[in-house]
Design a protein with these regions (language model features):
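Extended substrate-binding grooves/exosites of carbohydrate-active enzymes
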Residues: 1-228
Length: 231
């Protein structure tokens, strides 16, 4: 990974095996240590106009506070002594709200030496102070430049980008060129994801390929969920 200029890992979307943190400590890979939280479907439904904001989870609901604090505390206590961890992430794609703000404040009480990351406030900007980093997903380079032009002094990252199917990664170099610009504010991003979700399988002609959704006769399936399928 380091030989290919990869210098950071986001443990999306939950704690990873202990050995990964040890390896990052040893080899000098930065880490965003992410808490186990995702409620993607609830705010998708809200943004589609099917349900009001009251249906989004965890949002401002006090009944979620105890379990989310417990999860975040477990993440912190397990991984706090790993020097590779530079940033704590509250979770993935769970909208915003007061409960997440309170989680961020808890982490800052525990540890004022690391940054707090949370992307979901992009979709619910009521509590922008939840995150120390401006974090987006799948923005175009044009979108990133337009945001940076607004003058936000916080560091900007793409916590997910380049989830590309087939041969559709042609503009990836533009993100790298932007990150290489001095003092532009864009810190880089985390490619989703490092390893394709595929399994080697022979086709009907005996040729090996990387099989994925639908290639085993299963339905329903996510279908196109991998990159290149032939060596």
């Amino acid at each position: 990974m380091k030989q290919n200029n990869i210098n950071a890992i986001r443990t999306s979307h939950y704690q990873n095996q202990d050995a990964l943190y040890d390896l990052c400590d040893e080899y000098g890979l930065y880490m965003i240590a992410e808490n186990n939280l995702e409620s993607h479907g609830t705010w998708d439904i809200h943004q589609a106009g099917i349900r009001g904001i009251e249906g989004v989870l965890p949002n401002d609901k006090p009944e979620w506070k105890a379990v989310l604090f417990d999860r975040m505390n477990s993440t912190y206590q397990r991984d706090k002594n790993h020097p590779a961890v530079l940033i704590w992430s509250l979770g993935n794609e769970s909208f915003g709200g007061e409960t997440l703000l309170q989680m961020a404040e808890m982490v800052r009480r525990f540890d004022d030496t690391r940054l707090v990351h949370y992307e979901g406030v992009v979709n619910d900007p009521r509590f922008l102070e939840t995150t120390d980093i401006e974090s987006h997903m799948y923005s175009t380079v044009k979108d990133i430049k337009e945001y940076l032009a607004q003058g936000d002094k916080r560091p900007y990252i793409e916590c997910e980008y380049s989830h590309a199917m087939g041969n559709s990664n042609g503009a990836l170099y533009k993100y790298t060129e932007l990150a290489d610009q001095k003092d532009c504010g864009y810190q880089g991003g985390f490619i989703w994801d490092y390893i394709d979700q595929s399994i080697w399988k022979k086709d009907r002609y005996g040729k090996w390929f990387q099989a994925y959704g639908g290639d085993f006769g299963e339905r329903p399936t996510a279908v196109s969920y991998t990159h290149l399928t032939l060596p």
